[in-house]
Amino acid sequence: MKDKDLLKLLLQNGWKDVRQRGSHHRLKKDNQVEVIAVHGKDVPIGLLNAILKRTELK
């Protein structure tokens, strides 16, 4: 999965982009914070699974 697609998925599921510095987006939902780096590449499968698990999308 591309990092842009992951960012889009999180935004569609209620996460808000509260801050961006360079290519790093800080997303927030219900006192949870997740940082997604958007470099135009595929997200490694282990990192993708960890992010999806922490954001309760998996």
Please provide the spans of the model-predicted regions.
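Cytochrome P450 catalytic-core helices
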Residues: G22
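C-terminal structural segments of small proteins and small subunits
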Residues: K4, Q12-K16, K28-K58
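Short aromatic-glycine-enriched beta-strand elements
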Residues: H25
